């Protein structure tokens, strides 16, 4: 029911955004000049840029929605700014600068976003503990919310995993949303193979709210994803706890969206709390419960 409501709101916003942008493109001088007194032609000319933006939907519906929303929001802000300037100066602009500014800002903003999304940066955090972990330093790598296919495809992810392997990680933890409804089977298989890297303690995976898929439109099943992960040496944790080499624990929680999910009290039953405890929980909504249970480190998406 919730997803029907969300989809309905997105549909309403999408239709509203298209209508708003049509009225804005119609304000450009070249549209008025070409259309003359032909009102129908003016609307048709204003619709051409919308159709051009719509071609992005053939590559990704997600991309189309992102472009549409950003353009509509930036245009609304630019129109508001132009209105304020007009009130202050008491002069009408001879050209539709607000529209040109909205297009330029959207193009620059989304280009920067695309660049940052496709260029992965290494972020490092240093955490200290008084607990014995069997080594002077342990290198933990976390990969979350890849949403395979949105920014990185299978080959792109494989290149990033090679970078990670070169760092000589001790353990790799993937706290969910490795794939989603837009991911393709060939990319999924390549990405799972790329996870088969040399580590000290292995690669561990928990499910997020997107991994199992909300719809039936992708070309692989949740079971096929699980099969490929296991085939490549990945340990999947579903409300489970493992003692790694008798040194530290990794607890993998079911996602909060699941109907049945064990409490931290249940997951901590029988655990030696003198050992270091890592919890992987996709959604960062239960930190208080996890902190009270005695977890030392919680990794979320």
Regions found by a protein language model. Give the residues of each.
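Non-catalytic terminal accessory segments
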Residues: 1-118
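Extended recognition/assembly regions associated with phosphoester-bond processing machinery
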Residues: 18, 63-79, 125-129, 267-280, ...
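Histidine (H) residue identity feature
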Residues: 70, 83, 118-119, 147, ...
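Phenylalanine-focused residue identity feature
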Residues: 7, 20, 25-30, 58, ...
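N-terminal signal-anchor transmembrane helix
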Residues: 86-144, 149-167, 184
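Generic structural signal for short, solvent-exposed loop/turn connectors between secondary structure elements
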Residues: 53-64, 91-93, 131-135, 244-247, ...
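Arginine residue identity/basic-tract feature
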Residues: 24-27, 32, 40, 75, ...
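Soluble catalytic domains of enzymes that build or remodel membrane lipids, polysaccharides, and related
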Residues: 135-301
